[in-house]
């Protein structure tokens, strides 16, 4: 569901990588060990071309 409580159709994100907030900490720990970087950025703040 969306923050508003409305149903969210995940099909609209087909082909994209999604990071589920509940798993962020686990992913960060795993990726840090592998030398990767996980960063959280606001979705539209940097949407400039």
Swiss-Prot record:
pH dependence: Optimum pH is 6.
Regulation: Inhibited by Cu(2+), SDS and DTT. Activity is slightly increased by Fe(2+), Mn(2+), triton X-100 and EDTA.
Catalytic activity of the protein: 2 glutathione + H2O2 = glutathione disulfide + 2 H2O
Enzyme class at the top of the EC tree: oxidoreductase
GO molecular function terms listed in the Swiss-Prot or TrEMBL record: glutathione peroxidase activity
Temperature note: Optimum temperature is 40 degrees Celsius.
EC number: 1.11.1.9
Keywords: Oxidoreductase
Family: Belongs to the glutathione peroxidase family.
Function statement: Glutathione peroxidase which may protect the cell from oxidative damage.
Protein name: Glutathione peroxidase
């Amino acid at each position: 569901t969306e923050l508003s409580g409305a149903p969210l159709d995940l099909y609209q994100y087909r082909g994209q990588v999604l990071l589920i907030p509940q798993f962020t900490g686990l992913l960060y720990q795993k990726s840090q060990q592998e030398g990767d970087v996980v960063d959280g950025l606001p979705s539209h703040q940097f949407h400039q071309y």
